[in-house]
From Swiss-Prot:
Pfam families on file: Chisel (PF15355)
Coiled coil region boundaries: none
Expression sites (tissue/organ): Preferentially and abundantly expressed in heart and skeletal muscle.
Family: Belongs to the SMPX family.
GO terms for biological process, alphabetical: striated muscle contraction
Protein's UniProt name: Small muscular protein
Origin species: Homo sapiens (Human)
Length: 88
């Protein structure tokens, strides 16, 4: 029961991580990428060979938002699960 003995300031610091946009947790859950909507003509006019050159990794998906370490997010989520609601 170590989590219940933490000071309230620690609980608040952990709760600050809740405000991360859902796009960081689940790709596609956040706002849709605007590049496809704003520039459909450019994507159609570009030949497929240059598209393959743009992708450094063959199977990599472009995700909306900044690149985030999944391991860090999973650690944060596991911390959030065990914060008792009584101390909020």
């Amino acid at each position: 029961m170590n989590m219940s003995k933490q000071p309230v300031s620690n609980v608040r610091a952990i709760q600050a991580n809740i405000n991360i946009p859902m796009g960081a947790f689940r790709p596609g859950a956040g706002q849709p990428p605007r590049r496809k909507e704003c520039t459909p003509e450019v994507e159609e006019g570009v030949p497929p060979t240059s598209d393959e050159e743009k992708k450094p990794i063959p199977g990599a998906k472009k995700l909306p938002g900044p690149a985030v370490n999944l391991s860090e997010i999973q650690n944060i989520k596991s911390e959030l699960k065990y914060v008792p609601k009584a101390e909020q």
